[in-house]
Swiss-Prot record:
Its main location: cytoplasm. Belongs to the radical SAM superfamily. RlmN family. Its EC number is 2.1.1.192. PROSITE patterns: RADICAL_SAM. It comes from Finegoldia magna (strain ATCC 29328 / DSM 20472 / WAL 2508). Its cofactor is [4Fe-4S] cluster. The gene is rlmN. Residues 100-324 form the Radical SAM core domain. Disulfide bonds join 107-335. GO terms for biological process: rRNA base methylation; tRNA methylation. This is Probable dual-specificity RNA methyltransferase RlmN. GO terms for molecular function: 4 iron, 4 sulfur cluster binding; metal ion binding; rRNA (adenine(2503)-C2-)-methyltransferase activity; rRNA binding; tRNA (adenine(37)-C2)-methyltransferase activity; tRNA binding. It is found in: Cytoplasm. GO terms for cellular component: cytoplasm.
């Protein structure tokens, strides 16, 4: 008997091989792919264009993994909706839906937990469990779209986990979600956030995937950044910037930099001037983020006047800078917070 496989992780060409090897016509591959990624039919018994015999084969060989929404919280302040989604093995990830005037966006998790250990990020406060598979990333989108009866326009890989630490599965997910016969998401509407895995940034450039990337910078001085973000002990800021320059040269995609502003820690003129020296000659966008305080990181958020002062100083010095609009702050909107609270209530360490 053939070993169980996860057909939802397969491209159309891979599905063709599967169907032919099991005595079926190649065109069945496209039908199956569209059932999953276009029509949101996940149960082979509901694929009425397949014979009973073929449905039986799919049930026999396919290791069907169902994901489900276990909790949804709606913000009372904006149109943000925070989801807890349970994987087939019982692990839980966060997914955030955001509604804007011009588009919809979804923030996806790529791992269960995170290895990176950034001090101010709730995602790292419970142990790393495993990487998410491609179908589990797709499922976050499809479940939310079905729940809200909407079409999502933009994807940001900024949820729980470091996407480039799960490179193979994330790149496969991008292949699936951008396939014209499925979700047909524009590659230009996908943004990946990374803490700066230099080797993977270079690989991403060489693989010519063409998505947008944004770097979690948060401090312009290596010796201080290392204390906030342990990955800095492996890759210096200079190495990260060199990799970003290479990515821009290969893809022509403007690089984003994220900078969480922490009161009396990284918000003085000294830090602004250093950022200017690092970024002023680069085709980039600096995105200032107000710190979302968590219990394990006892620091304060700056007020809006300080944020505006920071932004104006950077723009005056030729660094294109914006302030990220805070979404869902009344529903533990920052990455990982809702999952942590849920795990704590259940006594999960």
């Amino acid at each position: 008997m053939q070993n169980k496989i996860i057909l939802e992780n397969m491209t159309v060409d891979e599905l063709k091989e599967f169907f032919v090897n099991n005595g079926e016509k190649p065109f069945r591959a496209l039908q199956y792919f569209q059932a999953i990624h276009k029509n949101r039919i996940f149960n082979p018994d509901e694929m009425t264009n397949f014979s009973n015999s073929l449905r039986g084969k799919l049930n026999q060989y396919n290791d069907i993994k169902n994901c489900s929404i276990i909790k949804r919280i709606d913000s009372k302040l904006d149109n943000t909706k925070k989801y807890l989604i349970e994987m087939s093995d019982g692990n839980i990830v966060e997914t955030v839906f955001m509604q804007y005037k011009t588009h919809t966006s979804i923030c996806l998790s790529t791992q269960i937990g995170c290895k990176m250990g950034c001090k101010f990020c709730a995602s790292t406060k419970k142990s790393f469990v495993r990487n998410l598979q491609p179908y589990e990333m797709c499922a976050q989108i499809y479940l939310v779209e079905n729940d809200l009866d909407i079409r999502i326009n933009n994807i940001v890989l900024m949820g729980i986990g470091e996407p480039l630490d799960n490179y193979d599965n994330v790149s496969r997910f991008i292949d699936l979600i951008t396939d014209k016969d499925g979700q047909d998401m524009s590659i230009r509407n996908i943004t990946l956030s990374t803490c700066g895995l230099v080797d993977k940034i270079i690989r991403l450039a060489n693989d010519d995937i063409g998505i947008n990337i944004t770097i979690s910078l948060h401090n312009p001085f290596d010796n201080e950044r290392n204390k906030l973000m342990p990955i800095g002990n492996k890759y210096s800021i200079e190495e990260i910037l060199d990799a970003c320059d290479y990515y821009f040269k290969k893809t022509k995609r403007r690089i984003g930099f994220e900078y969480t502003v922490i009161e009396n820690v990284n918000d003085s003129k000294k830090y602004m001037d250093k950022l200017v020296s690092l970024l002023k000659n680069r085709n980039c966008l600096l995105n200032l983020i107000t710190l979302n305080p968590i219990e394990e990181f006892n620091q304060k958020s700056p007020d809006r006047y300080k944020m505006t002062e920071f932004m104006e100083y950077m723009n005056k010095n030729n660094v294109n800078t914006t302030i990220r609009r805070k979404q869902g702050i009344d529903i533990d909107g920052a990455c990982g917070q809702l999952r942590i609270n849920n795990m704590t209530k259940r006594g999960v360490k």
